[in-house]
């Protein structure tokens, strides 16, 4: 843990272990924060807030830019930590660090974009303004699956806006998340501006509620499952704390009858199997027009069935270990249910270990669990449809709404389809897994609310205030 510029253990000395999902080897040992530790972290951030909020934008920008460079220099450390704690491939870890550094650089660019507005007033001699100010302490709760990207995203824009931060790391990758805070400390961030807590899994709910309930915490951002996101939203509502939630997904990729199949195959191979499918934007439903289904599925099978798989600690792979045996069990259940109800196995299959091969199931229907449930693993459903209208209806047949993709050589047609998809994000002729630091990233419906990047991020992590200046006398009401 890191509080008030110092590394520290839990106040009662408690710790918890994270073990490698593949062989059970000890990956990290981290402090198990107490409620007193949670309060101390918030108090440290609150004490540092006035000075940080008042800091000039040039100094804030330079610290964020320096932090981006330091993060990049930690690439090998992040790669080793992610492989040990979550089974992530070197490729995925490097991508995480690269994008995280860009998020930090984009945050540095935001410091001079926090502007306001002069509003015409009905009152004679009155200057009426809308201004944005830092909100206060921001609690960021980051997940394990893209730990560097999402850990940095939880704090970069809030810091750029003049807030101080408490980052609550994931119980599944405490060492990985701690490297982010070490990088910011090395970059020169003042004590208390960034604080970091780790907690035992059984204590997560109590720790989060303790911090959300603290009057100093003015914003909460959370990235994780829809189930846990609902719990976080309930806690935030109880204490009237605004939140930004990026939750689960069931991303559809629509392969229309005029699609460039080779391009679609490459995009879906990445979108479906990056980090073994353990990405909120991961392509979960491959919706393909019946007229091109056979050719497309054959090409996709050939592409993904040869993806390298293995232990990322010892070899270069695309598919490393999934995060735990619960993922294996869940995916095996979904495969079994689909096959029992008429689906056809294209490649892959059930797994006995956390090294799971890329699996495609054809002829999936709404009668199967995998049509509706997020796999969050390398098991993907192919749904055949007979028209553009049916493809859109199939894509929208879910409560989730994070990412989507449409493949067509006719861009006007693809745009028409994209406008009818109920998702916060849609990519035409590109993978569902995409992110850029400056974009308004976020979902709708059961995939959450609010946005992280660009102007939307500024709006989320500042208070909008109305202020007036009366420069004449007289005109008394009474």
Language model regions located:
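N-terminal Rossmann-like NAD(P)+-binding subdomain of aldehyde/semialdehyde dehydrogenases
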Residues: 1-126
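Short loop/turn microsegments at loop-to-beta-strand junctions
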Residues: 13-16, 283, 402
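Residue-level signal for inorganic ion chemistry
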Residues: 24, 60, 82, 104, ...
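Conserved C-terminal structural/oligomerization subdomain of aldehyde/semialdehyde dehydrogenase
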Residues: 25-29, 217, 254, 308, ...
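Short, well-ordered beta-strand elements within core beta-sheets of diverse protein domains
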Residues: 26-33, 48-54, 139-140, 253-256, ...
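Structural signal for hydrophobic packing residues in well-ordered secondary-structure cores
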Residues: 49, 53, 68-75, 79, ...
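Rossmann-like NAD(P) dinucleotide-binding subdomain of oxidoreductase/dehydrogenase enzymes
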Residues: 117-263, 385
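ALDH superfamily catalytic-core signature
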Residues: 203, 227-365, 428, 476-477
């Amino acid at each position: 843990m890191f509080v008030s510029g110092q590394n520290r253990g839990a106040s009662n000395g408690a710790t918890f272990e994270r073990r490698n999902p593949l062989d059970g080897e000890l990956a990290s040992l981290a402090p198990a924060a107490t409620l007193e530790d949670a309060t101390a972290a918030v108090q440290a951030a609150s004490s540092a807030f006035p000075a940080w909020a008042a800091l000039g934008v040039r100094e804030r920008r330079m610290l964020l830019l320096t932090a981006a460079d330091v993060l990049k220099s930690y690439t090998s450390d992040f790669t080793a930590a992610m492989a040990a704690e979550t089974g992530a491939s070197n490729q995925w870890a490097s991508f995480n660090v690269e994008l995280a550094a860009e998020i930090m650089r984009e945050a540095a660019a935001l410091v001079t974009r926090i502007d306001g507005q002069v509003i015409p007033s009905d009152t004679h001699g009155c200057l009426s303004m809308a201004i944005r100010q830092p909100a206060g302490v921001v609690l960021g709760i980051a997940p394990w699956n893209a730990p560097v990207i999402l850990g940095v995203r939880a704090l970069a824009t809030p810091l750029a806006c003049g807030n101080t931060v408490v980052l609550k790391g994931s119980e599944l990758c405490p060492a990985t998340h701690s490297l982010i805070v070490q990088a910011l400390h090395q970059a020169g961030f003042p004590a208390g501006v960034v604080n970091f807590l780790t907690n035992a899994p059984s204590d997560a709910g109590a720790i989060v509620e303790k911090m959300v309930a603290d009057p100093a915490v003015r914003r909460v951002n959370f990235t994780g499952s829809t189930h846990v996101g609902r719990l976080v939203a309930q806690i935030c509502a109880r204490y009237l704390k605004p939140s930004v939630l990026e939750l689960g997904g069931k991303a559809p990729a629509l392969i229309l009858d005029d699609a460039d199949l080779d391009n679609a195959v490459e995009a879906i191979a990445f979108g479906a199997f990056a980090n073994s499918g353990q990405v909120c934007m991961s392509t979960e439903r491959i919706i393909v027009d019946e007229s091109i289904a056979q050719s497309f599925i054959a090409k996709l099978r050939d592409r993904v069935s040869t993806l390298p798989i293995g232990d990322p600690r010892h070899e270069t792979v695309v598919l490393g270990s999934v995060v735990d045996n619960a993922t294996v069990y869940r995916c095996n259940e979904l495969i079994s249910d689909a096959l029992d109800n008429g689906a056809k196995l294209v490649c892959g299959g059930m797994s006995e270990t956390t090294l799971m091969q890329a699996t495609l199931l054809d002829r999936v229907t709404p009668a199967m669990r995998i049509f509706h449930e997020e796999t969050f693993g390398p098991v993907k459903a192919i749904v055949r449809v007979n028209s553009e209208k049916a493809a859109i209806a199939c894509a929208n047949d879910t409560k989730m709404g994070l990412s989507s993709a449409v493949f067509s050589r006719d861009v006007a047609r693809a745009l028409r389809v994209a406008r009818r998809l109920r998702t916060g994000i849609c990519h035409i002729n590109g993978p569902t897994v995409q992110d850029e630091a400056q974009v308004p990233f976020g979902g709708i419906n059961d995939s959450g609310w609010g946005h992280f990047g660009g102007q939307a991020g500024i709006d989320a992590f500042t208070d909008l205030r109305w202020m007036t200046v009366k420069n004449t006398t007289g005109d008394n009401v009474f």
